[in-house]
Amino acid sequence: MNGHEWLSPVLRLRSEMQPLRTDVEASVRSLPEIRAVIFDVYGTLVISGSGDVGSADTRDHSDLIEQSLEAVGIDDLLPKRPTMEMIHSQIESINARRRADDCPKPEVDIVEVWRRVLRQSGLELGAERVGIAVALAAQYEARANPTWPMPGSFEVLTALANAETPMG
């Protein structure tokens, strides 16, 4: 897998969403001394179709796993079917190992999660085949957590870029 092929399912499987209204009133004021803008992604630049980040998703996504395996073309290569329990177990295991005082909630390396789940399911992926795990992660995430740009995010990013404001 070269380039950004993993992005294709993320774009192809999405559909327009609108953000949920809140009771918070906007408070806009001039900040002339801004030297850079740092964004939180979910809920700021991107709408998430699965709800709040970190919310406990207890839905059974077996059908989404099967669709993703089929889309990547490895559904017939696995002696054992991956399960949500396997995915959650790997996420918990990786997070427990990476958790520290200075990082109480480590970011999940979803490609590593899928590599481990596939290994548990009987498919070992060496470094030369990591693209399979990348493709599978993209296929599954596009189905389980669809996203859509937050209204106005393109305009905000464009205005900041045109003003040469550093962003992160």
Please describe what each predicted stretch is.
Residues 63-77, 108-125:
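Helix-loop "lid/cap" segments that line or gate small-molecule binding pockets
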